[in-house]
Amino acid sequence: MFDESKFDVNLKLWALRIPRELCKSASRILNGYMLNMPRIKPITEDPTCEKTRLVILSESVKNADLSEIPEEKLNQLKKLSELEVVPHSVTLGYSYWSADHLLKQILPDGLDIPSSFETIGHIAHLNLHDELLPFKDVIAKVIYDKNYPRIKTIVNKVGTISNEFRVPKFEVLAGENGMETEVKQYGARFKLDYGLVYWNSRLEHEHMRLSSLFKPGETVCDMFAGIGPFAIPAAQKGCFVYANDLNPDSVRYLKINAKFNKVDDLICVHNMDARKFFSHLMAVSTCEDNLQSVADNDKTKEAAVSRGGETNSSGEEIRESNASINEPLGANKKPSGTTKTENGVGKDCKSIEGHANKRLRQTLLPIAKPWEHIDHVIMNLPASALQFLDSFSNVIQKKYWKGPLPLIHCYCFIRASETTEFIIAEAETALKFHIEDPVFHKVRDVAPNKAMFCLSFRLPEACLKQEE
């Protein structure tokens, strides 16, 4: 691809041959006059004698008489040992130089050097601009060489995202072909196949920002859950999560990650269209039929569930009897230690705090009733989530609902030519009702004239389905 030797730079330097036991003292005297370059040791082995070492002098020392070094320091050195000045060469090769330095040498003048890339486990996603595509293989080789073994696969996006699952097409430019990897975020671990599911490492802080708004015992509905970057942290806080995604591969990895992070008893996984998903949660008769086996088994029984130990046998029977792609992983369990108030809304108790301590906790096994209360709804599909706000119109039945209506967290893109008022108008058009006290949070810039925002608001009571 290219000759690595062409990047070699040979430095002609001077060095002092010093007895090995005196090198430490000599280096103190020569402070400021020794070679000071990243990853190059100024004291090295002497190839001619095991009892001595070579103290490499800086490039500023040009002459063998060491005239650039103050006489006072030279006199101190002479008291330590007889001065023996020898020529020494240092070759800075391909392995020494940074990726940025090498690419500046390789790429034509005027092209922007790719200074960063997204890291997904062992995978580096370059996302090269069109003008860099003719040099994609060279760029990939340099980045691979300079980041291995932390990075084992280099990929680049091919074309635009056009499929319904928001998953780009990639080509592997260097390294292994394996696209399955593992990502860590704030105490959670996620397994995924980067070629099959959507993942954006740059949203890590947003995942935790939103999760920090949730309280233990709350119920969260994640309409575009992916592999669980919002659902898993929410469950780790002791929330009960209804998580949905249209992509079957995302759902498969969501289930894997729920179990991997030991929160599968707090996440109910669905694989369906987002509108149908929310309608399904609000359909009283359908949910009652699905959960009848739980009700018949024991409506109020408490089971002590150990994090890594045995589970109650009846709980296992419930888990098996309700297992399907549109059923909860954990047999429709409600949040750990949740108690009911007079209005039926779940409140915190100490057993939920125990969930975070990863020890023993108490888990209630009553019928889950999402049509009665949900605290938060997450809509992380910024390209089209606003259009899905019609999912909430005339679906929640007023006669069954208890407590405040949910907070909606809807992600969207706002271009430089657009205003928040324009986005509110678009949201109200889809919702068909006025939104009170909307809050915008800027997540990140995605392009020079385009930013990602989170619009949060309380669902208007006008959206409720009135009693007939």
From Swiss-Prot:
It comes from the Eukaryota. It is an enzyme of class 2 (transferase). GO terms for molecular function: tRNA (guanine(37)-N1)-methyltransferase activity. Gene3D superfamilies: Met-10+ protein-like domains (3.30.300.110), Vaccinia Virus protein VP39 (3.40.50.150). SUPFAM superfamilies: S-adenosyl-L-methionine-dependent methyltransferases. GO terms for biological process: tRNA N1-guanine methylation. Its main location: mitochondrion. S-adenosyl-L-methionine binds at residues 207, 245-246, 273-274, 380. Residues 309-325 have a biased composition (Polar residues). InterPro entries: MeTrfase_TRM5/TYW2, SAM-dependent_MTases_sf, TRM5-TYW2-like_MTfase, TRM5/TYW2-like_N, tRNA_Gua_MeTrfase_euk. Keywords: Cytoplasm, Methyltransferase, Mitochondrion, Nucleus, S-adenosyl-L-methionine, Transferase, tRNA processing. It catalyses: guanosine(37) in tRNA + S-adenosyl-L-methionine = N(1)-methylguanosine(37) in tRNA + S-adenosyl-L-homocysteine + H(+). Residues 301-348 are annotated as: Disordered. It is found in: Mitochondrion matrix; Nucleus; Cytoplasm. Its EC number is 2.1.1.228. GO terms for cellular component: mitochondrial matrix; nucleus. PANTHER family: TRNA (GUANINE(37)-N1)-METHYLTRANSFERASE, TRNA METHYLTRANSFERASE. Belongs to the class I-like SAM-binding methyltransferase superfamily. TRM5/TYW2 family. Monomer. HAMAP family: TRM5. Specifically methylates the N1 position of guanosine-37 in various cytoplasmic and mitochondrial tRNAs. Methylation is not dependent on the nature of the nucleoside 5' of the target nucleoside. This is the first step in the biosynthesis of wybutosine (yW), a modified base adjacent to the anticodon of tRNAs and required for accurate decoding. This is tRNA (guanine(37)-N(1))-methyltransferase 1. It comes from Arabidopsis thaliana (Mouse-ear cress).
